[in-house]
Amino acid sequence: MFASLTPRTLTLAALCVAAMLPLSVANAQQATEIQVTYDGAFQPSELRAPAGKTITVKVKNNSAKAMEFESKTLKVEKVIPSKGEAVVNVRAQKAGRYEFFDEFNEKARGTLVVE
């Protein structure tokens, strides 16, 4: 299969792949990273992020029970074990206020403010 490929074709293919790598790295670097801890309540309870950028929420669960980081408006949910950590990836959002909560303790609520 590869025997019919010429050196010129292989070089062109390699250059195309090499040209795409910086773009994927640049896109990954553009994500806004937010840290939040949980121990029966979210700290901080109000998170802020710029509009139009991917958001990475790093959640550290310090409680003795598992929790589920959930947001219906952001369309994300992730179970995080007791004393565990997880990353929740959020797609780029328009400006607005987006509520999140612990599915297992709905009194524990927070807001993501996208500006």
Predicted regions and their residues:
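Asparagine-centered strand-capping/turn motif at beta-strand->loop junctions
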Residues: 59-61
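N-terminal post-signal-peptidase region of extra-cytosolic proteins
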Residues: 38-45, 73-75, 83-87
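Sec/Tat signal peptide C-region and signal peptidase I cleavage site
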Residues: 23-28
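Bacterial N-terminal signal peptides that target proteins for export
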Residues: 2-13
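Histidine- and aromatic-enriched segments that form or immediately flank copper-ligand environments
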Residues: 64-82, 110
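N-terminal edge beta-strand
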Residues: 29-54
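Bacterial N-terminal signal peptides
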Residues: 11-22
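Extracellular/periplasmic metallocenter environments
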Residues: 32-33, 80-115
